[in-house]
Design a protein with these regions (language model features):
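N-terminal, charged/glycine-rich beta-strand/loop interface patches
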Residues: 2-172, 176-178, 186-207, 212-219, ...
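Conserved small/polar residues in nucleotide/adenosyl-binding loops
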Residues: 253-255
Length: 255
C-alpha cells in the first residue's frame, strides 16, 4: 500500500507560502480555469494577491483537529473521529459552542497520510503556542486547524468594563498547550503586526486585535485621564491589554 501525489506541490502554478510542522499553505498563483468573460477580473485579482489557497496537512502518526466542513480530500491511512471523550466532554464542548458561537467539537484526523482543505481566498496564519506563553485567545471565526495536543476551550473576559462595553465578546475561543495552530484570516501575514509586551500596556482604538495571550488583562478604558481629555482627543474608549504576552493586530482593516 502507499500513495503518490502528482501535479500538486510540483505544479508550476503552485507556491508554498508557509510551512511549519505538519502544516503547509499552498497558493495558486493564477486562476487558470477562468473564462473569457472573467479573465480580466481574475488577472487583476491575482495582481492584488487575491488568490486561492489550501491548507495541506501531512500526518506521520500525528493527529489534528480541523474546522467542521473545511476538509476537501485526504489520502492514506487516515481515520476520522469526533475526538469526544465521554458524555462530560460532550456537554462541556456543547456549552462552549453556545457561549462563543464557535464550535469546540472539531473533526479529528489521525494516522499517516495527507489532508487538504477546501480552497479559500483567505490567508492561513500558522502560529506556535510556545510563542504565546502556551495559551492564545482568538476572535470568533478565525480558527481553522490545530494539532490535537492543543486544547480548545472558552475564556471569559474577566474585567467588568471588558464584559459590558468591550467589543471583543464576553467569551472567546482559547487554544492552550504546546503545538501549532492555523488561523484563517482576511489579511496576509505581511499585514499583521506582532507586539510582545513585557509587563507593559497596549491600547487599541477599535477591534484590531485578532489574537492575544490569555494571561493578558483586557479592559476597556478612556483614552485620556479625564472625560474632557478623551473627548478632545477624539478617541473615546480604547481596548487595553496589560501584562506580559503577545498580541496580533491588523494594521489596515477593521474586524
Amino acid at each position: 500500500m502507499g500513495f503518490q501525489i502528482f501535479n500538486f506541490e510540483d505544479n508550476s502554478n503552485v507556491s508554498v507560502v508557509s510551512h511549519k510542522g505538519i502544516f503547509k499553505v499552498i497558493q495558486y498563483d493564477k486562476d487558470l480555469s477562468c473564462t473569457a468573460d472573467d479573465a480580466q477580473m481574475k488577472f487583476y485579482m491575482s495582481q492584488m494577491n487575491v488568490k486561492k489557497r489550501q491548507l495541506m496537512i501531512t500526518l506521520n502518526g500525528e493527529s489534528v483537529n480541523i474546522q467542521p466542513g473545511a476538509m476537501q480530500w485526504y489520502v492514506g491511512d487516515v481515520h476520522q473521529s469526533t475526538g469526544l471523550k465521554g458524555i462530560g466532554d460532550t456537554i462541556k464542548k456543547f456549552f462552549n459552542a453556545q457561549v462563543t458561537g464557535e464550535s469546540t467539537i472539531k473533526p479529528q484526523y489521525e494516522g499517516t497520510g495527507v489532508i487538504v482543505t477546501e480552497p479559500s481566498y483567505k490567508h492561513y496564519i500558522i502560529e506556535d503556542l510556545d510563542d504565546w506563553n502556551g495559551a492564545m485567545c482568538v476572535e470568533d471565526g478565525l480558527y481553522c486547524a490545530s494539532e490535537t495536543k492543543v486544547n480548545l476551550s472558552t475564556s471569559m473576559i474577566k474585567s467588568v468594563s471588558g464584559q459590558t462595553i468591550g467589543d471583543e465578546g464576553l467569551f472567546n475561543l482559547c487554544l492552550k498547550g504546546s503545538g501549532k495552530v492555523v488561523l484563517e484570516c482576511n489579511v496576509p501575514q505581511e499585514e499583521l503586526i506582532t507586539i510582545d509586551l513585557h509587563n507593559d500596556t497596549l491600547k487599541i482604538d477599535g477591534s484590531f486585535a485578532i489574537a492575544w495571550s490569555e494571561n493578558l488583562d483586557f479592559t476597556v478604558e478612556r483614552s485620556g485621564k479625564t472625560l474632557i481629555g478623551s473627548a478632545m482627543s477624539g478617541e473615546g474608549l480604547v481596548n487595553v491589554y496589560r501584562g506580559t504576552g503577545r498580541v496580533l493586530i491588523l494594521s489596515l482593516i477593521h474586524i
